[in-house]
């Protein structure tokens, strides 16, 4: 399930950050989590991202992907709207990541499936996702959710 960031998940968010850092992963969809030292600092920044944070930025809606059975944080996803010129080429509307210990379990596909109706609620009938050419797992996730290759840069 997707939930908005809140204090209830503070320890798990910081644990997520630690696991991603130790694995050397990029923090796609994490709303600057890699650049903060505390949950409070991150939640403040995430709140500012929901508005037009600064010139060149667009509003961003951030969600935590929480496994229903045990309320464990498995991933993060953000939805940026509307597309800026930069996002049209790099990043797209949606960014996401799955914590290393929870990969290959279908969570990325489920997160994307759950966020698409939210995108429509914000007036985006068509969304752009980007991924590196060599990221086969992300390509499969996008295709599984109805995406198609538009172009390569």
Report the location of each language-model feature.
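Short aromatic/hydrophobic contact patches that present stacked aromatics
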Residues: 1, 95, 128-130
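GNAT-family acyltransferases
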Residues: 1-93, 118
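Polytopic alpha-helical membrane proteins, predominantly small-molecule transporters/carriers
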Residues: 62-66, 99-102, 131
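Short coil/turn motifs at secondary-structure junctions
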Residues: 82-84, 101, 134
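Conserved acetyl-CoA-binding loop-helix of GNAT-fold acetyltransferases
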Residues: 95-98, 104-117, 121, 139-144
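Conserved GNAT acetyl-CoA-binding A-motif
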Residues: 119-130
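Conserved beta-strand-loop-alpha-helix junction that forms the acyl-donor binding cleft
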Residues: 129-139
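Conserved catalytic-core motifs of GNAT/GCN5-like acyltransferases
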Residues: 130-131, 143-153
